[in-house]
Regions:
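Active-site segment of metal-dependent pyrophosphate-handling enzymes
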Residues: 12-16, 58-62, 66-107, 124, ...
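Short histidine-centered catalytic/ligand-binding loop motif
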Residues: 46-54, 155-156
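Short helix-coil junctions and helix-kink-helix linkers
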Residues: 168-177
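RNA substrate-recognition surfaces in RNA-acting enzymes
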Residues: 178-209
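Long, intrinsically disordered, low-complexity Ser/Thr/Pro-rich regulatory/activation regions
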Residues: 197-230
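Core subunits and conserved enzymes of cellular information-processing
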Residues: 1, 5, 23-25, 30-31, ...
């Protein structure tokens, strides 16, 4: 196809925006930063960047995630493309959004400081630039659907955790209290947890037994799915 075919078409930018979610034992948090450049300088934004020459959209998202977290090969999944004509006040930009689930304890303060970034509770989100609030809302909707058919938690929780911590994570995702008995019945049916001979005594004198995921069984359910609707 000749170059003239492309010359008559409008040129625009392609960007990626990353919804980086973490869990602090109580609530879901998202990583935000204040923009240091125009347009909308000084306002809160998701982590993102433009797709560079010679890289795919997936590679761009992976690069942004590694740069913003200092962690390689993070789980990520595409949410969708956002291309409203007037979404960016600077130029015509189409953005492809990805979400990633991370353990907040893996982040160093230096990484956050270098990007002027901070963890913000989902329940306390400020007004973000462009359509970034919509991207987060769409991510939460996807996460709820995923939680109903796939195990979630491996990327968000520490290696060892209590059952109350795991239930609190699901309650944060579903944004509603869950019945303890029904929740544990579902977990037992999946058989993805290994009980450890260690107790966490931070929350009570008796303490709660710690568990860890059986990675092989966990990945099996990730691949084939499971009815975990609560």
């Amino acid at each position: 196809m000749s170059a003239a075919f492309y010359q008559d078409e409008v040129k625009f930018y392609v960007a990626v925006d990353c919804i980086i979610l973490g869990f602090n034992n109580k609530e879901l948090n998202v990583l935000l930063y204040k923009r240091s450049f125009e347009s909308m300088k000084g306002q809160w934004s998701l982590m993102g960047g433009f797709v560079k020459s010679g890289e795919s959209v997936n590679e761009a998202a992976s690069r942004v995630l590694t740069d913003c977290t200092g962690i390689e090969h993070l789980f990520m999944e595409q949410i969708g493309a956002y291309g409203d004509v007037s979404r960016d006040l600077g130029e015509r930009v189409i953005s492809v959004a990805y979400y990633s689930l991370v353990n907040m304890n893996d982040f160093s303060p230096e990484i956050l400081e270098s990007h002027n970034a901070t963890w913000t509770k989902i329940s306390e989100l400020p007004d973000l630039i462009f359509d970034h609030n919509q991207m987060i809302n769409d991510t939460l909707s996807v996460l709820k659907k995923k939680a109903a058919s796939r195990p979630i938690g491996f990327n968000l929780l520490p290696e060892q955790f209590t059952l109350p911590q795991l239930q609190t994570l699901y309650e944060a995702i579903y944004q509603t209290p869950l019945d303890k008995r029904n929740f544990r019945k579902k977990l037992n049916a999946m058989d993805i947890l290994e009980k450890l001979d260690i107790k966490d005594k931070k929350s009570s004198k008796r303490g709660a037994f710690l568990y860890k995921f059986n990675e092989k069984k966990y990945n099996k359910w990730v691949e084939q799915g499971f009815d975990f609707s609560l």
